[in-house]
Amino acid sequence: MNILITGKNGFLAKEITSYYKDRADVNLILTDRKTLDPRCFLAVKDFFDNNKIDIVIHAAVRGGKRGHHPDIADIFDNLSMFQNLTRFSDKFQIMFNFGSGAEFDRARIIDSLSEDRIQDVLPSDYYGLAKNLMSRQIVSLQSNIYNLR
């Protein structure tokens, strides 16, 4: 089984890698922006044209971290990575995207919000808005792409 993990230098990717690294039945393909820039459509197209992937674990992200100064590139980069990967959903069996509580707006208390309320909120920050729009698309697609939060 070939598993593509984007954002190999991030916390989530490192944790997932440590879980799968000793499995003989799993071939991990770990990427960062130097080996596969998911913001670039042509790079993603070339990657899927030349690699057989069973599972995509999309852990690459821009923003969302403490100390990160948010800017408009947060929404552009996050949405372009997601869109470029999802355009090739016919080239893999399943994709997992990592959501965030920020999808519901960081200014809200989200403990009592149900998942179906994602359509009712629009976060005020770039990172949260990007995550919200990705979640909305995943819900509307009802395909082989899933959001983990």
Predicted regions mapped to residue ranges:
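N-terminal Rossmann NAD(P)H-binding glycine-rich loop of SDR-like oxidoreductase domains
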Residues: 2-23
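SDR active-site strand-loop-helix element
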Residues: 6, 31, 56-62, 95-101, ...
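Short glycine-/acidic-enriched loop or helix-start segments at secondary-structure transitions
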Residues: 14-16, 67-68, 106-109
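Adenosine-cofactor binding site in Rossmann-like domains, unifying the SAM/SAH pocket
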Residues: 27-46
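Glycine-rich NAD(P)-binding loop of the Rossmann-fold in SDR/ketoreductase-type enzymes
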Residues: 39, 70-81, 121, 125, ...
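NAD(P)H-binding glycine-rich loop region in Rossmannoid oxidoreductase-like domains
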Residues: 41-78, 90
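Conserved Rossmann-fold NAD(P)-dependent oxidoreductase catalytic core, especially the SDR/UDP-sugar
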Residues: 83-124, 146
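Active-site Tyr-X1-5-Lys
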Residues: 122-146
